[in-house]
Amino acid sequence: SCMKAAPMKEASIRGQGSLAYPGLRAQGNLETLGGPNDATRGLTSLADTFEHVIEELLDEQQVIQPSKENKDADLYSTRVMLSSQVPLEPPLLFLLEEYKNYLDAANMSMRVRRHSDPARRGELSVCDSTSEWVTAAEKKTAVDMSGATVTVLEKVPVPKGQLKQYFYETKCSLKGYAKEGCRGIDKRYWNSQCRTTQSYVRALTMDNKKRVGWRFIRIDTSC
């Protein structure tokens, strides 16, 4: 996020709900359609249906009240994965969030949005960011919803052994505009800075009394 003020002031973020995934099941195939024309109509229908499903996935949100004390970390997200090895792709929810943010910013019909890739128009982000999978061994500790520091457990026991906890973190890039302020802000009139903001994710942790449990902790999720 880009903080802008003259003089610089703090800004708060409203909490957003966590996303729920309804069950989906695809049926049929293009071979069951009645010819080339029907196949073309079928492809168009599938594309429209896919966009509709994405919007439904993102619109099904639970209302969660954020903590008043943590105004920069009041978003709820699902960027945690249990795996025996480093995940090769970003989490699905992250991709859906990025897609929805783009659709909201575009403010166009679904058909127009599909052909309006910002990369093709030469658009740039206000703040540059980097994203990567981080292990619990690298995080070691985190702050939970009560403000207490807890230990992030590296491994989670499962019936057939143990899996590692991975966190998909996004933070401001140390290169480029992050040091000079937000891109596109007139420096003659405004002071600005790119700042990493946090969200809550659910992870297996241990508190200072050695009690192990699933808690919401803060991780870096945007710039």
UniProtKB/Swiss-Prot annotation:
Any single Pfam family the record assigns to this protein: NGF
Signal peptide: 1-5
Keyword Ubl conjugation among UniProt keywords: no
InterPro entries referenced in this protein's UniProt entry, alphabetically: Brain-der_neurotrophic_factor (IPR020430), Cystine-knot_cytokine (IPR029034), Nerve_growth_factor-like (IPR020408), Nerve_growth_factor-rel (IPR002072), Nerve_growth_factor_CS (IPR019846)
Disulfide bonds: 127-194, 172-223
Cellular component, GO annotation: axon; dendrite; extracellular space; synaptic vesicle
Protein name per UniProt: Neurotrophic factor BDNF precursor form
Gene symbol of the encoding locus: BDNF
